[in-house]
């Protein structure tokens, strides 16, 4: 009899409580879990949830799609947000669609978008 067969025979003689203690001891010693594997049907749902979490963006670009009817107000807001001069801000607004701010946090992007929308602009977050 090989050592593996002997070990299997000895484990087979353990009570349920002893077997449970053995599993816990092995989990601790080797840093593993004896949790059952997920069945095939459950695996399809799990990666979809993980993919959605992984795809959640942390940085956004604020894009000015159109200036709208109140172009002067939009130019003022673009100047305040970007720090551009009057001429550069006017060129940006006239050349819409243009990216006003790149790689900003979600909160900041929403704040900028609200300011631009309040001024009459059409805005998109990418």
UniProtKB/Swiss-Prot annotation:
The keyword Ribonucleoprotein applies. GO terms for cellular component: cytosolic large ribosomal subunit. It comes from the Bacteria. GO terms for molecular function: mRNA binding; structural constituent of ribosome. Pfam families: Ribosomal_L12, Ribosomal_L12_N. InterPro entries: Ribosomal_bL12, Ribosomal_bL12_C, Ribosomal_bL12_C/ClpS-like, Ribosomal_bL12_oligo, Ribosomal_bL12_oligo_N_sf. CDD domains: Ribosomal_L7_L12. The keyword Ribosomal protein applies. One of its GO terms (biological process) is translation. Keywords: Ribonucleoprotein, Ribosomal protein. Homodimer. Part of the ribosomal stalk of the 50S ribosomal subunit. Forms a multimeric L10(L12)X complex, where L10 forms an elongated spine to which 2 to 4 L12 dimers bind in a sequential fashion. Binds GTP-bound translation factors. Forms part of the ribosomal stalk which helps the ribosome interact with GTP-bound translation factors. Is thus essential for accurate translation. Belongs to the bacterial ribosomal protein bL12 family. This is Large ribosomal subunit protein bL12. It comes from Chlorobaculum parvum (strain DSM 263 / NCIMB 8327). The lineage of its organism: Bacteria, Pseudomonadati, Chlorobiota, Chlorobiia, Chlorobiales.
């Amino acid at each position: 009899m090989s050592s593996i067969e002997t070990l299997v025979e000895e484990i087979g003689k353990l009570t349920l409580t002893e077997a449970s203690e053995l599993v816990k001891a092995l989990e601790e010693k080797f840093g593993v879990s004896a949790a059952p594997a997920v069945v095939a049907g459950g695996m399809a749902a799990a990666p979809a949830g993980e993919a959605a979490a992984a795809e959640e963006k942390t940085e956004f670009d604020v894009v000015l799609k159109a200036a709208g009817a109140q172009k002067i107000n939009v130019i003022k807001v673009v100047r305040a947000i970007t720090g551009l001069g009057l001429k550069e801000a006017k060129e940006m607004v006239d050349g819409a669609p243009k990216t006003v701010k790149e790689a900003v946090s979600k909160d900041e992007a929403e704040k900028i978008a609200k300011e631009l929308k309040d001024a009459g602009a059409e805005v998109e977050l990418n």
